[in-house]
């Protein structure tokens, strides 16, 4: 990890990266297994609407990944807050997070997470601990992310593809749907956007799974508003703005709900939250699922 230091954010780099990701996605689309992000657009917020979503909105989710998920008190918690504001009066959203810092998908035993009390709270009934049991189908969706550079490394990319296939099969065997979370480029390595997008789109196509285009949302945001800092000082992990942008992208991609106008802002300035909501929704609307 780099020592904390200030860093510049360059609009031109964001535009170039997003354009490159567009080119790759378009090529994959011609091959019959890709998504097509749209180019940066005006920042005016579109009217709230619904994107194409699963047949039934997930009521529960398991997040499997690394520190990109658990920074800022956990991305899953922010998604829960966004859902609570977008679905007033509906039964609560349930989630669990299985994350290990700096790890890839090959570190996770997804099968074990589906066992009774495999993951979840431990309520106590004195004097005996009663383990939670969420039944035969503890989760509706499992949102998975590999380590930030694993899909790009020649020796680790095959491991990513293998784990994507094995974990998808495990998730479906337990009655849930797999979802792949496309991670973002490092602030000082914008060229990561294109190959990461290609790797996750390919994984989604190979396994008939949805993809959350968070990496493309980051590139779009940087291109449109470089003053909104999406990273902490290490230039890799998300700032609160970065986590919020990613959570808004999950809301649109997995639940088909527009984040635009959502009252939950994670304590961010209203104008910044509105911009991030808009960028997330624009990205989701312009992204064709594999």
Give the location of each predicted region.
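N-terminal secretory signal peptides that target proteins for export/translocation
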Residues: 1-11
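Sec-dependent N-terminal signal peptides
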Residues: 12-26
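Conserved catalytic region of serine esterases and O-acyltransferases that act on ester linkages
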Residues: 40, 46, 237, 247-290
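N-terminal module-boundary/linker segments of secreted carbohydrate-active enzymes
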Residues: 45-85
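Conserved SGNH/GDSL esterase-like catalytic core that processes O-acyl groups on lipids
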Residues: 70-155
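Alpha-helical cap/lid subdomain in secreted, periplasmic
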Residues: 125-240, 252
